[in-house]
A protein has these predicted regions:
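Acetyl-CoA-dependent GNAT
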Residues: 26-83, 87-88, 100-101, 106, ...
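Conserved catalytic-core motifs of GNAT/GCN5-like acyltransferases
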Residues: 116-118, 135-152
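Short beta-strand-to-coil "C-cap" segments at the C-terminal boundary of structured domains/repeats
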Residues: 156-159
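Short glycine/proline-centered loop/turn elements that form peptide/ligand docking sites
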Residues: 96, 100, 122-125, 142-148
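A short beta-loop-alpha structural element at the N-terminal edge
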Residues: 7-35
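Conserved GNAT acetyl-CoA-binding A-motif
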Residues: 107-119
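Conserved acetyl-CoA-binding loop-helix of GNAT-fold acetyltransferases
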Residues: 92-105, 131
């Protein structure tokens, strides 16, 4: 087992259940190549800023970055998750939830009372966020030539 993976055990009817917990940490400069394998939208000039401001997280399993989360502040005051991406091979196994939980805990510890995110309505992510307690709070359509996209759904959650 890699050093960057934790084990959580629980006694249960004369045997132990063991669950592997991936390491979730702030993104570091050394993660740049792995980061861009999952995030094709962040301008490279912004990566150093995410590292410096601790506005990015990586989920590491067996020494490999399998998920990322990055955020900024909406209206300079509300944490807004801009990107959550889990490698396809690891999707549907709870890693996204663990990344969101860590981010929400950190935001609450920093004194924030709510968080936000968004997703296009044609993506399954909206259902994921609702399961985590996020509420639909509006949306917008981008119909400017060259930037068109389906309705972007804004979601919010009190923490």
């Amino acid at each position: 087992m890699a050093l960057n993976t934790l084990l959580q055990t629980k006694e249960c009817d004369n045997f132990q259940l063991v669950r592997i917990i991936p390491m979730i940490r702030y993104v570091e400069n050394q993660d740049k190549t792995a980061w861009y394998a999952l995030d094709h939208d962040l301008p490279e000039t912004s990566f150093d800023e995410k590292v410096r401001n601790r506005q990015g997280y990586v989920c590491v399993e067996d020494g490999r970055v399998i998920g990322i989360l990055r955020y900024n502040l909406f209206w300079d005051s509300i944490p807004f998750c801009n990107m959550l991406h889990i490698d396809k091979e690891y999707q549907g196994k709870g890693y996204g939830k663990q990344l969101m939980d860590r981010w929400e805990q950190d935001m609450k510890s920093s004194g924030y009372g709510m968080v936000m995110t968004s997703t296009q309505v044609n993506e399954d992510a909206q259902h994921f966020y609702r399961k985590l307690g996020y509420k639909d709070s509006g949306g917008f359509v981008v119909d400017i030539p060259g930037y068109e996209q389906p309705l972007e759904l804004i979601l919010m959650k009190a923490i």
